[in-house]
Amino acid sequence: MTKRDRTIYSCDACRSRKIKCNRQTPCASCHKSKRDCVYTVSRQRDAQITNRKLDKKTYHQISAIEKKISALEGKKGLLQVETINFNKSFTDQTPLVELQSLFPYLLLSKQDPGCVLVRHHCHHLLEKDPRYFEYSQLLADLSLTKRHHLTARAKALLGEAYIPSPQEGHTIDQLKHVLSLNPNFRFAGNFADPLTSFFSLIPPAWANKQLVDTFFQHIYPVIPIIDETDFNTSINRVLGPQIDGHYINSFPSIGSADDLPFLALFLLVLRISYMYTPGACPVSYDTLRAAETIMKEFDITKTHSLTALQAEIMLRFYKIVAPESYTQSNYVQVSVGVLIQNCYSLALHRDPEYIGEHNPKQQHLRRKIWHLLLRMEVIDSAIFQTILSSNPDASDTKLPQLIDQAPPMEQSIVKHIWRSTDLFVSLRKLVEINSKTSEDTPLETVLELLVEVETKLQAFLATIDSEASTVFYNDLVIFSVNFLLVYMYYSLYLFKGPTPLGNKYLLKSAQILFVDLARTRSTSLFLAYFNLNYIHLVLMITNFLRMRVDCIIHRHLRAQDSSVQDLQCCRYFLKIIFFSHVKELGNYSSSHKYAWQMRKVYLTLAKIMERSSDVLISNDPELVKSAAVDIPVKEINKLLEQYINFKGFTPTTLFDPTDNELIDEMQHENLWNAMENIEYSEKVYSGWIDAIKNVPSNWDWDYWDFLKIS
């Protein structure tokens, strides 16, 4: 028989003396005799008896180990979990603010010790010349004689295509005539009264049919928010009959208020399609301005129709990716927020089945619009670090379903929405952590989420097929996810500092930037916007690294250490990459305003970095010392050399331009100044506000805010 494991109710002292115990703590007997009152269960008592039988040495060893275990278990609860906040300084935990991001991920420039030196130096330069960043450094030092010579030569070379500078005193009509020689910037009609001049703004009917077909064949997969059949039906109803491919009406047929946003939507579809495939029958820039004029009639405080929401989404899409636009984070934040709130007012966050919508086509359309906007704001947040406006917990809208006998393109779009859903769910969690300011996040949570996003990205890539209709959508997802991964891993490197783990994060960020993203290519006009953001990311990171390398070389030379060969090689590679991309921005500047704005900033930084010793002298030695920490230079050199070979870059110069290069630079500057003057002078105001329309607009950047350290 085995003994029963009884529970002991008497304390050890009373049990050993075989007296009655009142079972208190302490019991009456122990209290009276001032003894320790201990209640030991039978198994523990057996262990005590066993311990007595052991030799004293072994017993003391076991007791010491038990005490250490108890002490460690006590400390375990006191250990602090390592946390991170991406919106606070990693050195002193002060809040970091970037009120108006000129370019994506500028918060990194306030975290990186090397770039902090550059920001301090730029601040000193701006104190001397507040407009230091506002002009091209290639043109800044030109003498008046040289400028006159270049202007005369440009007029001789370009003839009518020469774009005059604001100082040459041309009228707005003369500027529009010159710019109209560029197919992207044709002007036509009175966009301030889009109904009266509607048919003068658009091409003939035969050309419009081709443009609409182009939209649904190539652009629709990226922004599938309209139904092709309904759209073509509305075109015929509103624009009226045709004879020999030309409209015969002189005024659109407006049957209801909903036809106004349809006209704006139609104008935007034409302009987007033309920018995708410029042809013999151009769609003027005024079609965009006419669409904007129409949409101003829809007050954001009122509930809109679904058609108005579609037009708003299309307008926002165009303004972000259009070559003549320049998008900052404040516009991205406000515009997507308004769209999300309009979706709530139209109940798009509730599944159509639950609100009495039984038309399968409308159900499908409403679901696509809602889930497209959810993805759109996550992509915006991943790139511009904007705050999410939607609440997925308040939505029960199902994913779009595959429809029997649907066109292959529509089936492919639905499949890609399903395939990318898991990835966007994880990406959303990551951007929420990135934008969190009120509390820190456990570092382990961030690392687990990064692994999850990378795993799901690879799973998404494995599902990609060769269908041309979905190429843009795939690239859009790949770009936005990898952009954020570069930012997050580089932030983790700055957080961990010069440690083996920190260096691992630096190499991970560099691998994605210089290898994974370098292989993502697209010739789409609309993805040129993402290509430009990629160039910005490369320029920003290479500038950080170059300043850090200069600081390390400075430290070695002061210590009379001549072993800087790898560091000098790294600086050489970084300079090749930086100069080559700044030159590439010059090629983009003839058609993309964003590229021109970016080129001015990075030309200035290139000029500053050519005299990096001035940066070191103008900064506190302790700041220089903090930037002079070692980096895994050999591993970085391999990635940089591989990137240079892949891109075909060769050593080039920036600050010894030929006359033709200077003429190009002047023409780019004149182009965007002329566009700004035209837009400002012809801006459409309400009648009561016309009296103050001559007040200068505040369109320039606030460089002082840009250079604030915190």
Curated annotation (Swiss-Prot):
Which keywords fit this entry according to its UniProt record? Activator, DNA-binding, Membrane, Metal-binding, Nucleus, Transcription, Transcription regulation, Transmembrane, Transmembrane helix, Zinc
Query: Where is the DNA-binding region?
Result: 11-37
Give the matching Pfam families: Fungal_trans, Zn_clus
Which SMART domains does the entry link to?
GAL4
Disrupted-gene phenotype: Leads to increased drug susceptibility. Displays decreased colonization of mouse kidneys. Shows decreased yeast cell adherence to silicone substrate.
Assigned GO CC terms? membrane; nucleus
Q: Which PROSITE patterns match?
A: ZN2_CY6_FUNGAL_1 (PS00463), ZN2_CY6_FUNGAL_2 (PS50048)
Q: Which InterPro entries match?
A: Fungal_TF_Env_Response (IPR051430), Transcription_factor_dom_fun (IPR007219), Zn2-C6_fun-type_DNA-bd_sf (IPR036864), Zn2Cys6_DnaBD (IPR001138)
Where, subcellularly, is it found?
Nucleus; Membrane
Q: What is its main location?
A: nucleus
- UniProt xrefs under CDD domains: fungal_TF_MHR (cd12148), GAL4 (cd00067)
Annotated membrane topology is: Multi-pass membrane protein
Segments spanning the bilayer are 475-495, 525-545
Tell me, what is one Gene Ontology molecular-function annotation carried by this entry?
DNA-binding transcription activator activity, RNA polymerase II-specific
Q: Does the keyword Nucleus apply?
A: yes
State the Gene Ontology BP annotations: biological process involved in interaction with host; DNA-templated transcription; positive regulation of cell adhesion involved in single-species biofilm formation; positive regulation of cell-substrate adhesion; positive regulation of cellular response to drug; regulation of DNA-templated transcription; regulation of transcription by RNA polymerase II; single-species biofilm formation on inanimate substrate
The job of this chain, per UniProt, is described as:
Transcription factor that controls the expression of CDR1, the major multidrug efflux pump. Required for yeast cell adherence to silicone substrate and plays a role in virulence.
Q: What is this protein called?
A: multidrug resistance regulator 2
Lineage of origin: Eukaryota, Fungi, Dikarya, Ascomycota, Saccharomycotina
